C-alpha cells in the first residue's frame, strides 16, 4: 500500500469525531508463470461459468441504467486527503466526482460524520444514488492498536489475529469504514524488507492460518452486519520476494516456488471468504502484477473461482508506465483492466481514457461490465444500498476496557523469550531496586507501523517504565535513556551505567523505532540502530544481572552482543498495551510462550537464511570446506524459526503414526494419516508450549525443503502434566507443486520424515512411507 495513505490520514483526521491452522491450504493447479503482455494484446477473457449470486438481478438492473461514464466511475477509487505525491484530486474534486456519479470508492477517510457527509452527496445528489465504498488501512487496530502482524504470528495462535480483526472491524465500521486493505499475507525470507512487519514471517503454512483467521475476524458470517468490514488479501503476488529486500523491487520466481511458497496464504484467505484482492507492486518474470493476466485472471479467477473484486495498489496502474510496459495512461489502463484489475486506486486512467479505449477496441464493454458488477456486488453485500450511513451517535471514539484487555493479552502472548541464562527472568516483584534504561524505556512510540495517526496521538502505548513501577511498587526504580533510538551520541551512557550499577537488576529496552519498519523502510543493516549496541555492552560491563527487551518490527542481528546478555525477550512493537504486557511477562504474571515466525540471522550478509531452504548437492559440513557455507559464520541462523523459551521446560515425545505406510491413491481419495505426540511440562511453573510438526520428502522429482511446517498447536500445561497433541496429514500436506507450466501437484511414493518438537530444529522423528 502506498506510503502516501498514512500522511493522508493526518489531513482527514480534522473532519472526524474522533487454534486453527492445522489443515492444508495448498492452492489448486494453475498456469501461473507470467507471459509478457504485448502492447497490442487483447484482453484476458472474462471468466465464465460463475455461480449465480444473491445480488445478480439487482446488479444487472443497475448496470442497464448506467451510462458509460457512471460505469467507469465505479472503477475509480480516490484518496480523501493527502499532502504530497503523485495523483489525487483533493477533497473538493472528490465531492464533485461523487455528485456526478463518477466515483466508486474513497480511501483514507473515516469518522461517521465525515463519511456520512460525503455519502449523502453520492446517494442524494448523484443520478442513480449509488453509495460510495469507504476504505482504510486498518492493519492491526483502529483505536485499539494491537501488536504488529509479525508479532501476532509469534503467538502461534490464529485466534490472536481473529480477535484483533474483530475489534478493529467493530471500531472502524462504527466510524464509517466499510473495507480494510488487510490482511497482508506476503511470505518473505527477507528481514531487510520493511514490510515484513505487516506479514506473518517466512512460512506459508503459518501465514495461511493467520490470513484465514484475520479474514474471518474482519468479515464474520455476514458483511452487512454493522460491526464487520470487507477484507482485502494483499499483495497478489510474491511481493515478499523483492530482490535485496528493497521495497517495490523486482521478483523472479519459479512456478514451483510461486505455488509452494507464495500462493498458499492467498488460497487460504479466499477459502475463508476474503471479499477483495489487491495487486502487488512488483513484477514477476518481468511482468508487473497489475498487468499480469495469468495471476489475476487465469489463476485467481479461472482456477480458484474468485468472484470478488481486485483493486490496484496505490498508483499501481500509473506505475505501469515507469515499469516500462505501458506507453501512457491509456495503455496502462488497458493493460490493468484486461489483466484483471477491477478498481483503480489513486490514478485516474480508466475513468479518463475508458471511452477512447472502448471506441478503439482495446477494452471491451463486457469486461467493463464485469468489473463494475464486482464493485456493485460488494456494495450490496455490505448492505450499503439499504444502509448507506453510519450511526453518528453510535460511533466508537476510544478503546474500551475490553478491547484494551484483548490487546494486552495479544501482546504478552506474542512475546518470545530468546534466552534466559541463570534464570534471570522472571523478575521478583519484591526486588529491592531495578533500573530501566534504553531509548524505549519511557517511550510511547511502541505501536508499530501502519497506525492511524489520530489513534497514535490520542491513545499512545503505555510505557515500560510506568508499568514496571506499577508492577513493583515497593522497589526503587531508576531510569536513564542512555542513548536515542537513532544517532551516535553516547553522552548519556554513563548515566545509564550508573543506574545499572546502583540496582540489583536492569531492564535494557532497545530496538527499532516504528519508522524503521513498514512500507518503504528497507534496511541494509538490521542491527540495533545508532549507539544502542554500545549501551548494551556498557550495561553488560557492569557485571550486574540484566535483561534485554527488543522492541522491533523485523528480525534483528544480535550476534555482536547477545552472548553477553543473560536474558533476551523479543517484544516486537506490542501496541497500545505495550508497557503493561511487558510487565506481565517480565514479572511472571504471564509465562512467555511465543515462538519466532521468522529466523533471526547472524548477520545481514547471511540473508536469506530461513528454515525451509532446499537441499543442495553439497550440504553444510563444518569439516569440509567445499560445502554450502560461509567461511566466516557458523551455519544456520542465530535463532531459528519456531524457537522460543519459557520459564518452565517441556519434553516432547517421538511422533506416533496411525500407519507407517499409505498408498498414494488412498491419499488422493481423501485418506489421512494421524500423527500424535505427547508433550510434558517438566518444570515447576505452568506454561505454554507450541508443538510443531514438520515434514521432509527424502527423494522427490524436484529438490524439496529440508523441512516444511505442516501443523502446530499451542497447549497450556501445569507442572508435571502431559497432553497428547494430534495432527492429520492429508495429500496436500505431503505433496508439492512442480515446475510444470500448468501447475502440476505431485504426490510421489517414497519416505517422508516427520519431526515434532518446540522449533524447526525438532529432533523427535518418525518415518511415513508412501507406496
Name these PLM-found stretches.
Residues 2, 24-760:
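Glycoside hydrolase catalytic-domain context in secreted enzymes
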Residues 2, 8-27:
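N-terminal export signals
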Residues 762-771:
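Short beta-strand elements
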Amino acid at each position: 500500500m502506498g506510503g502516501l495513505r498514512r500522511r493522508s490520514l493526518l489531513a482527514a483526521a480534522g473532519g472526524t469525531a474522533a487454534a486453527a491452522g492445522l489443515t492444508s491450504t495448498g492452492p489448486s493447479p494453475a498456469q501461473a508463470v507470467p507471459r509478457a503482455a504485448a502492447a497490442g494484446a487483447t484482453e484476458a477473457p472474462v471468466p465464465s461459468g460463475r455461480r449465480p449470486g444473491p445480488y445478480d438481478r439487482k446488479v444487472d438492473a443497475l448496470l442497464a441504467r448506467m451510462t458509460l461514464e457512471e460505469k467507469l466511475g465505479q472503477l475509480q477509487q480516490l484518496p480523501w486527503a493527502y499532502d504530497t505525491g503523485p495523483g489525487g484530486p483533493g477533497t473538493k474534486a472528490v465531492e464533485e466526482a461523487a455528485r456526478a456519479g463518477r466515483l466508486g470508492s474513497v480511501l483514507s477517510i473515516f469518522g461517521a460524520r465525515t463519511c456520512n457527509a460525503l455519502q449523502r452527496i453520492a446517494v442524494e445528489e448523484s443520478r442513480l444514488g449509488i453509495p460510495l465504498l469507504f476504505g482504510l488501512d486498518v492493519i492491526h487496530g483502529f483505536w485499539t492498536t494491537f501488536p504488529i502482524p509479525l508479532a501476532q504470528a509469534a503467538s502461534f495462535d490464529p485466534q490472536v489475529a481473529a480477535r484483533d480483526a474483530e475489534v478493529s472491524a467493530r471500531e472502524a465500521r462504527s466510524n464509517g469504514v466499510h473495507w480494510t486493505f488487510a490482511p497482508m499475507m506476503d511470505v518473505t525470507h527477507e528481514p531487510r524488507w520493511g514490510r515484513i512487519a505487516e506479514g506473518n514471517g517466512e512460512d506459508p503454512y503459518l501465514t495461511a492460518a493467520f490470513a484465514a483467521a484475520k479474514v474471518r475476524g474482519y468479515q464474520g458470517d455476514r458483511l452487512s452486519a454493522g460491526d464487520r468490514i470487507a477484507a482485502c488479501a494483499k499483495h497478489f503476488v510474491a511481493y515478499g520476494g523483492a530482490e535485496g529486500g528493497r521495497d517495490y523491487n523486482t521478483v523472479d520466481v519459479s512456478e514451483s516456488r510461486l505455488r509452494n511458497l507464495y500462493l498458499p496464504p492467498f488460497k487460504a484467505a479466499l477459502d475463508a471468504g476474503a471479499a477483495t484482492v489487491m495487486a502487488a507492486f512488483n513484477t514477476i518474470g518481468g511482468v508487473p502484477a497489475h498487468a499480469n493476466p495469468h495471476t489475476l485472471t487465469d489463476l485467481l479467477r479461472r482456477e480458484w473461482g474468485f468472484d470478488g473484486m481486485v483493486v490496484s495498489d496505490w498508483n499501481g496502474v500509473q506505475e505501469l508506465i515507469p515499469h516500462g510496459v505501458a506507453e501512457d495512461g491509456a495503455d496502462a489502463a488497458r493493460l490493468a483492466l484486461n489483466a484483471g484489475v477491477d478498481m483503480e486506486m489513486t490514478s485516474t486512467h480508466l475513468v479518463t481514457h475508458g471511452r477512447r479505449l472502448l471506441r478503439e477496441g482495446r477494452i471491451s464493454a463486457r469486461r467493463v461490465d464485469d468489473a463494475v458488477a464486482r464493485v456493485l456486488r460488494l456494495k450490496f453485500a455490505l448492505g450499503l444500498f439499504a444502509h448507506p450511513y453510519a450511526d453518528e451517535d453510535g460511533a466508537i471514539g476510544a478503546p474500551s476496557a475490553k478491547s484494551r484487555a484483548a490487546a494486552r493479552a495479544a501482546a504478552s502472548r506474542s512475546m518470545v523469550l530468546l534466552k534466559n541464562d541463570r534464570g534471570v527472568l522472571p523478575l521478583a516483584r519484591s526486588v529491592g531496586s531495578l533500573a530501566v534504561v534504553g531509548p524505549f524505556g519511557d517511550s510511547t512510540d511502541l505501536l508499530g507501523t501502519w497506525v492511524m495517526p489520530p489513534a497514535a496521538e490520542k491513545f499512545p502505548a503505555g510505557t515500560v517504565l510506568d508499568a514496571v513501577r506499577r508492577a513493583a511498587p515497593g522497589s526503587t526504580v531508576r531510569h536513564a535513556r542512555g542513548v536515542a533510538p537513532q544517532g551516535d551520541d553516547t553522552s548519556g551512557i554513563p548515566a545509564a551505567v550508573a543506574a545499572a550499577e546502583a540496582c540489583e537488576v536492569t531492564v535494557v529496552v532497545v530496538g527499532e523505532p516504528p519508522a524503521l519498519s513498514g512500507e518503504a523502510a528497507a534496511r541494509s543493516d538490521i542491527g540495533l540502530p545508532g549507539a544502542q549496541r554500545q549501551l548494551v555492552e556498557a550495561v553488560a560491563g557492569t557485571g550486574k544481572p540484566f535483561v534485554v527487551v527488543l522492541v522491533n518490527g523485523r528480525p534483528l542481528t544480535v550476534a555482536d552482543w547477545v552472548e553477553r546478555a543473560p536474558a533476551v525477550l523479543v517484544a516486537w512493537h506490542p501496541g497500545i498495551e505495550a508497557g503493561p504486557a511487558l510487565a506481565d511477562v517480565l514479572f511472571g504474571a504471564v509465562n512467555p510462550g511465543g515462538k519466532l515466525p521468522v529466523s533471526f540471522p547472524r548477520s545481514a550478509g547471511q540473508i536469506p537464511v530461513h528454515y525451509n531452504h532446499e537441499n543442495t548437492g553439497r550440504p553444510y559440513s563444518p569439516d569440509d570446506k567445499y560445502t554450502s557455507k560461509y567461511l566466516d559464520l557458523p551455519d544456520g541462523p542465530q535463532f531459528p524459526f519456531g524457537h522460543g523459551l519459557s520459564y518452565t521446560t517441556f519434553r516432547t515425545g517421538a511422533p506416533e503414526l496411525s500407519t507407517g505406510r499409505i498408498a498414494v491413491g488412498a491419499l488422493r481419495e481423501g485418506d489421512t494419516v494421524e500423527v500424535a505426540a505427547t508433550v510434558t511440562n517438566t518444570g515447576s511453573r505452568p506454561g505454554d508450549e507450541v508443538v510443531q510438526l514438520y515434514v521432509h520428502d527424502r527423494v522427490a522429482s524436484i529438490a524439496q525443503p529440508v523441512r516444511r511446517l505442516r501443523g502446530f498447536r499451542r497447549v497450556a500445561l501445569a507442572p508435571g502434566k502431559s497432553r497428547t497433541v494430534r495432527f492429520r496429514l492429508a495429500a496436500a500436506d505431503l505433496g508439492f507443486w512442480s515446475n510444470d507450466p500448468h501447475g502440476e501437484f505431485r504426490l510421489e511414493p517414497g519416505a517422508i520424515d516427520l519431526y515434532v518438537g518446540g522449533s524447526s530444529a525438532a529432533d523427535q522423528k518418525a518415518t511415513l512411507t508412501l507406496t
